[in-house]
Amino acid sequence: MENSNKVPISKIGLIMLMIFSTFFMSPHARRLEGGSNIDSQRLLHELMVDRIKQKRSRTDLEDKAVPGDRLSPGGPNHIHN
């Protein structure tokens, strides 16, 4: 009979351990008040600045008429080939 009493106590102990461990984990995953609004606005601003820089660099390349392929000035060197 003693063995049958130990099994439910160990199960109850394990369940209580799991419940109490959730109390210790909750402070680490909490959300701070007000911080998310500032971070989202800052992120949006940085993304817009990056997008403007990309548009400017594309238009600069198109205006300068830089060829897409790199060519050597004298053509291929026949000695090396």
From Swiss-Prot:
Modified residue annotations for Hydroxyproline: 73, 76
Q: Which family does it belong to?
A: Belongs to the CLV3/ESR signal peptide family.
The name on file for this protein is: CLAVATA3/ESR (CLE)-related protein 12
What's an example GO cellular component term for this entry? extracellular region
Disulphide bridges in this chain? none
Please list the residue ranges that the record marks as compositionally biased, kind Basic and acidic residues: 55-67
Q: Where is the signal peptide?
A: 1-31
Keyword annotations for this protein, in alphabetical order, are: Differentiation, Glycoprotein, Hydroxylation, Secreted, Signal
Q: For the region Disordered, what residue ranges are annotated?
A: 55-81
The Gene Ontology biological process terms listed for this entry are: cell differentiation
Superkingdom assignment: Eukaryota
Asked whether the keyword Acetylation is assigned, the reply is no
Q: Which residues are glycosylated?
A: 76
